A protein has these predicted regions:
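Short, well-structured alpha-helical segments
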Residues: 38, 42-45, 63, 103-114
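Generic N-terminal amphipathic, Lys/Arg-enriched alpha-helix
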Residues: 20-29
């Protein structure tokens, strides 16, 4: 399924309005930089929404998981424990975001956040879309390896050039989103 331009744009704007302000207030991650909230995390949220729509799953739940994945990072150096450290903070943020989740959805988000650095394959669509969205940039930088991806669409995006996808992002983001994210480049 090819995601609808308005579904992506509307879901990303929902994230900017309902999720990003809570994450900005609570997260300890840097706002800019290689793992920055406004740079990397926003791009992971966008790709997560896109990947969720490609498999006809809830883009809001995936957007929330993506928004939380690096909230406990304190720098851009390798930090395999930041996912586990994020759990108490992620649980608190989930409680403050105006979106009703079932207990299994909440647990799946927390599992996805805690385990996104493990390199394993995803047990559910929330982990699949979030992990694939995060790993896409690594694939662009280090080379594509299908064994690290779950969704077919993410495999396709990850083996193509980042410039192609950045152009796709520019076409599917609102003016507000583009202002917040600034200049889109390969760092995303």
């Amino acid at each position: 399924m090819k995601p609808n331009k308005f579904q992506i744009k509307n879901t990303f704007d929902w994230y900017l309005t309902n999720v990003l302000p809570v994450v900005e207030h609570r997260a300890i991650q840097n706002k800019y930089g290689y793992h920055g909230l406004y740079t990397h995390t926003n791009a992971v949220v966008f790709r997560g929404i896109d990947y969720a729509l490609s498999i006809e799953k809830s883009p809001e739940i995936v957007a929330l998981a993506c928004a939380l994945h690096d909230i406990a990072r304190t720098n851009d150096t390798p930090d395999p424990e930041h996912g586990q450290r994020a759990i108490p903070l992620a649980d608190r943020i989930i409680s403050e975001v105006p979106y009703v989740l079932t207990r299994p959805e909440r647990d799946s988000i927390l599992y996805a956040v805690a385990n996104h650095t493990t390199g394993m394959l995803a047990p559910d669509y929330i982990s699949a879309c979030m992990w694939d969205a995060d790993r896409t940039r690594i694939s662009w930088e280090c080379g594509f390896d299908a064994k690290f991806f779950t969704t077919e669409y993410a495999k396709q995006v990850s083996k193509n050039s980042p410039e192609e996808y950045l152009q796709f992002m520019r076409q599917h983001l609102s003016h507000r989103a583009l202002r917040i994210m600034g200049e889109l480049n390969k760092q995303y």
